[in-house]
Amino acid sequence: MPSFAALLPVILLGAGAVTAMLAAPRLPGLARWIAGFALVAASVALALRLGAPDGLSVLLADDRMSRLTGLVVCLSGIGSLAFLRPDGPSKEGPALLLLATLGGVVLTGAVHAASLFLGLELITLALVALFVLPLDRPALEAGYKFLILGAAAAATLLMGLALGHAATGSLALEAFGGREALLTFAAALLLAGLAFKLALVPFHMWTPDAFTGAPGAAAAFAGAASKVAVVTALVRLDAVGLPQVWALGLGTFAGVSILLGNLAALRQDGVARMLGYSSVGHAGYIAAALATGAASAPAAALFYIVTYAPALLAALCVAALIGRATRISDLRGIVWRRPLAGAAMAAALVSLAGLPVSAGFFGKYVIFTALIEGRAWALLALAIAGSALGAYYYLRFVALIFRRAPDPADPAVRWPERTLLGAATAIILLLGIRPDLLLDQIRAALP
């Protein structure tokens, strides 16, 4: 049985969600502060135990990897909380965000079918509610697509878990390694269910609508925190030794996602929609690394998604500030109107493009290294082509950011958004100079 200290982050997030939900109808401002306190407290609890001895229960692993990625999920949750405005329509937003974060923390430590499914569905159901809270047409459309596709993905995942249990007699994920026919079908269904959460082609249709129609907090969490948790689950399953169809499927999804995601993003003039389609390509890079089976692939996948999270949060924050229906021309001269927002957007886009000196540069480097180590030459060629396309359309936006415009200065940015933009930019630049600070932690966390 895990110790109280190991369960403390889960307890804090669960208790915070219930308390924030009770406070929301009459004291929505207090609900935001409760959510912020619970997220910070859970982050501190995870950070203080990073170097603690590993533990294991039937449902959850209490190891360094779950603590590190759980910490990133909580920090991304704090960043997503900055998108919730006190005067917004979402009184229940803080509580729902805590529930989604709780699901992410559970998923990072999942070693059993029950905890895997529970973590994924906590994230999905909380995000569905967050998506539709504004109750306008774009939000309802985004929520509807996410709900329908999420239900199909959940059914697919459950069927995979059921077949795995039928083949092995166990619901522990480590028992799913093998070459039996039933396990082959189980691995294929598991991959399809998780591919939806990671937004791999052809399960990506919800992503552009989520980034443009859903509230900023929901889009930020779906794009950053939830994907950190899902990649952690993929890394754990990848280590089990699943049938060959797992690697084959990952490689196929990866190649198509890199190509179609970047080509679709290339044609977008809207900031948020471009970020939505490009996130499909970024998911493809991660899947490509894991498909190789290279020794460095798990560390590369985790490093990439962790460095991707602050860049996406910063870019979505700026997109929310200027209006997520904004077109590329509306970014013209933003660095002169809102210096912090413009600088943060430029740093985020440079990192997403994988250019020096940014965290994203080393993210691309470790992915390419894993592809070379695994001799996945076709995937490497697609990844290089996708990166070149990405650099082109990201730099299109960056060029406009610094172009002088006669528009007057915009209103000041609120302090939660200033804090998010400043912290995200600092992380992007710090990891662009010292990637070893994170990479060493990830390598130490892997078995």
Curated annotation (Swiss-Prot):
GO terms for biological process: ATP synthesis coupled electron transport. HAMAP family: NDH1_NuoN_1. The chain crosses the membrane at residues 4-24, 27-47, 68-88, 92-112, 113-133, 146-166, 181-201, 215-235, 245-265, 280-300, 302-322, 342-362, 376-395. Disulfide bonds: none annotated. GO terms for molecular function: NADH dehydrogenase (ubiquinone) activity; NADH:ubiquinone reductase (non-electrogenic) activity; quinone binding. It is a multi-pass membrane protein. NDH-1 is composed of 14 different subunits. Subunits NuoA, H, J, K, L, M, N constitute the membrane sector of the complex. Keywords: Cell inner membrane, Cell membrane, Membrane, NAD, Quinone, Translocase, Transmembrane, Transmembrane helix, Transport, Ubiquinone. This is NADH-quinone oxidoreductase subunit N. It is found in: Cell inner membrane. It catalyses: a quinone + NADH + 5 H(+)(in) = a quinol + NAD(+) + 4 H(+)(out). Pfam families: Proton_antipo_M. NDH-1 shuttles electrons from NADH, via FMN and iron-sulfur (Fe-S) centers, to quinones in the respiratory chain. The immediate electron acceptor for the enzyme in this species is believed to be ubiquinone. Couples the redox reaction to proton translocation (for every two electrons transferred, four hydrogen ions are translocated across the cytoplasmic membrane), and thus conserves the redox energy in a proton gradient. Its EC number is 7.1.1.-. Its main location: membrane.
